[in-house]
């Protein structure tokens, strides 16, 4: 089934349900016969005491070396300390950089400038919405998520919102190129430029400029509040959405919830040097080890990864097997209305792959 090329991929199990769903994803990928040399590296809360950090250098070294990672979710404490690292793509910096979470550290240290998340309806998956076929392109390096904030006495807290022309153009070009290469009809820039006239205004200006280079792709723009209202009212009006960092974080979770939940939406963080494939959802430590987690989102991220690796046949095989098992509704996890465990659901997909191959 798979090709003869041995691909090197970094596997980051993650926290909580991470080891279960990365293990499930690995099983279905290997069932296709694709040859992958997995570099398994651990980070997150599980290694903090041993390593003195949630993101050891060897994790970033591995992803830099392989260029591709399949990553489980991480526990991100509310509040608490920032993650400091001297690691950069060009060697160790004299002064460490601080990031708000291990997820943010991996993305920004590896210079992944764009996050792509997909939300699609699946036959057999309960949802209040139909006709959802949305791609969210999220700028990933700036906005208020640069974590530049400070207190002024005890009564004020200030956060800096940064939007640059270069990062905005990178996200916009990615969105239009994705639309062009995947038969998408429209790109919508999402913003709040009526209030944030300088920052979101710059983002919108750049998107408009980039749109002129893709005349075959329809372009429009909407304010963030109108966008979320429109998504829940008429999701079929939307195709590819491009937006600054914080809006993208929120809208991608909304769209995932519209197609069956966070367990159904795959994603990837993409940069010039690396691509990190992950699910939209968190680590869910409350159900860790119970064998009940839905691994579909990460499995679909694995499908995206296979396509990047040039293993199109294997990607299509995994995707078809997932869709058929979901449609049959015999072996689906409890969040989708079934009774199957994570391992039972995974085994059903593996068996389907064997039958389809």
Name the predicted role of every residue range.
Residues 1-5:
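Short, Lys/Arg-enriched N-terminal segments with co-localized hydrophobic residues
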Residues 9-31, 153-225, 237:
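Glycine-rich phosphate/diphosphate-binding loop of Rossmann-like nucleotide-binding domains
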Residues 15-18, 67, 137, 175, ...:
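Buried hydrophobic positions in well-ordered alpha/beta secondary-structure cores of metabolic enzymes
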Residues 25, 29, 207, 298-306, ...:
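Buried hydrophobic packing segments
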Residues 35-60, 231:
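N-terminal beta-loop-helix "entrance" segment that forms/cooperates
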Residues 45-47, 57, 230-333:
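Glycine-rich phosphate/nucleotide-binding loop
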Residues 49-158, 246:
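N-terminal glycine-rich phosphate/adenylate-binding segment common to multiple enzyme folds
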Residues 141, 147-189, 193-196, 312, ...:
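Glycine-rich phosphate/pyrophosphate-binding loop and the adjoining helix
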